[in-house]
């Protein structure tokens, strides 16, 4: 376009530079933008068509991808089941039952048996257990064989059991001592019960002398109440009778007394059958012990002294010039024998226990005492 063709704008002067036009440049830039948008839209449409096509193939064959992955990673293996076993042949029909045959008499069967040949092998020696408690002697030989077999089996089992126990196996160590269970119970009517284990305080009325057996008595010094402490059962002043035996031996310092019966001032009587004890509950009654030393050894000592003095006098009268005295020579055998005999007769004298009247003792109740048959409780 020449300058001549450019129209002259109104209001402009000659030689003045005018404003540049933008129409030509603007139209070219618009075409480029439209072309770019067309290309981008075409690409997007192609991508959408490709996605729809792949999704349709996946829906038509959902296992194709998994099959492809498994085929590419793991080789295909075919497992076949073993053939089924052939059918079992049918069972043959059961044969008809045989007719019952009559049982022959034992004697007839024994007669029909052929005799044994002479070259029969010798029987094994059978262990004779006739003296054993397991052997039962009967008239029938069959019973004897059965008893002998049972005895052998029992002996074998016992030997095996003993072998296991002697070996100290773990099985025997895992079994502890078996103890029986005990069942608890309630005391009946404790208002009239003097329970086992109670101790009655008592003062002796009679002197105890263990030279010979004898009877004894004592007086209760303290009231005894029921097991629950509500009812007075044995009043103070009740009399208890008992007995003792002359059983004191060398080295013993107590005597056993059995208290048999108690009688209250109201006339109530009940059997005790309980042992005597000291005030602290120790078994037996202590007392003064006379060991009878001089009675046991006095005669032997006297005879030995007489023998020694006799030998000394014999040596002095004999005129011996020596000042030494030999007490082991000379006669005196008869005197020694007398001393030994006297010692044998007196060495076994038992000691005697003495316990004076008025001393405090105890009685250990060895059983439950029930006073419900003579006492009753009435409300006030």
Swiss-Prot record:
Alphabetical list of CDD domains matching this protein: VirB10
InterPro entries the record matches: T4SS_VirB10/PtlG, T4SS_VirB10/TraB/TrbI, T4SS_VirB10/TrbI
Region annotation (Disordered) ranges: 1-26, 78-102
Protein's cellular compartments: Cell membrane
Pro residues bias: start-end ranges: 81-100
Topology relative to the membrane: Single-pass membrane protein
Principal cellular location given in the protein's record: membrane
Keywords, in A-Z order: Cell membrane, Membrane, Transmembrane, Transmembrane helix, Virulence
Keyword Transmembrane helix: yes
Superkingdom of source: Bacteria
GO cellular component terms, semicolon-separated: plasma membrane
Keyword Cell membrane: yes
Transmembrane segments: 33-53
Pfam families, alphabetized: TrbI
Similarity field: Belongs to the TrbI/VirB10 family.
UniProt name for this protein: Type IV secretion system protein virB10
Taxonomic path: Bacteria, Pseudomonadati, Pseudomonadota, Alphaproteobacteria, Hyphomicrobiales
Primary gene name: virB10
């Amino acid at each position: 376009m020449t300058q001549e063709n450019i129209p002259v704008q109104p209001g402009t002067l000659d030689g003045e530079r005018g404003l540049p036009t933008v129409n030509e440049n603007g139209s070219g830039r618009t075409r480029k933008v439209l072309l770019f948008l067309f290309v981008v839209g075409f690409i997007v449409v192609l991508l959408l068509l490709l996605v729809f096509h792949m999704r349709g193939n996946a829906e038509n064959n959902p296992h194709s991808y998994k099959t492809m992955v498994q085929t590419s990673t793991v080789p295909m293996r075919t497992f076949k089941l073993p053939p089924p076993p052939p059918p079992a042949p049918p069972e043959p029909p059961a044969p008809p039952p045989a007719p019952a045959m009559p049982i022959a008499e034992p004697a007839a069967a024994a007669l029909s048996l052929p005799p044994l040949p002479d070259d029969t092998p010798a029987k094994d020696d059978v262990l004779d257990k006739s003296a054993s408690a397991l052997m039962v002697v009967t008239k029938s030989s069959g019973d004897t064989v059965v008893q002998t077999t049972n005895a052998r089996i029992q002996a074998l089992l016992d030997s095996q059991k003993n072998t296991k126990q002697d070996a100290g196996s773990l099985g025997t160590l895992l079994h502890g001592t078996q103890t029986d269970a005990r069942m608890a119970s309630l005391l009946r009517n404790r208002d009239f019960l003097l329970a086992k284990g109670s101790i009655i305080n008592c003062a002796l009325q009679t002197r105890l002398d263990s030279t010979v057996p004898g009877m004894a008595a004592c007086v209760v010094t303290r009231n005894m109440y029921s097991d629950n402490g509500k009812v007075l059962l044995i009043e103070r002043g009740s009399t208890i009778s008992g007995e003792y035996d002359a059983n004191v031996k060398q080295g013993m310092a107590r005597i056993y007394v059995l208290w048999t019966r108690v009688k209250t001032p109201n006339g109530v009587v009940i059997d005790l059958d309980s042992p005597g004890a000291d005030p602290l509950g120790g078994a037996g009654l202590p007392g003064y012990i006379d060991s009878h030393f001089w009675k046991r050894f006095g005669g032997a000592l006297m005879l030995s002294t007489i023998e020694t003095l006799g030998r000394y006098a014999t040596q002095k009268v004999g005129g011996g010039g020596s000042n030494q005295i030999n007490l082991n020579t000379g006669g005196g055998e008869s005197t020694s024998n007398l001393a030994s005999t006297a010692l044998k007769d007196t060495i076994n004298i038992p000691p005697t226990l003495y316990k004076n009247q008025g001393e405090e003792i105890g009685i250990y109740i060895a059983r439950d005492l029930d006073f419900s048959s003579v006492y009753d409780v009435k409300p006030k």
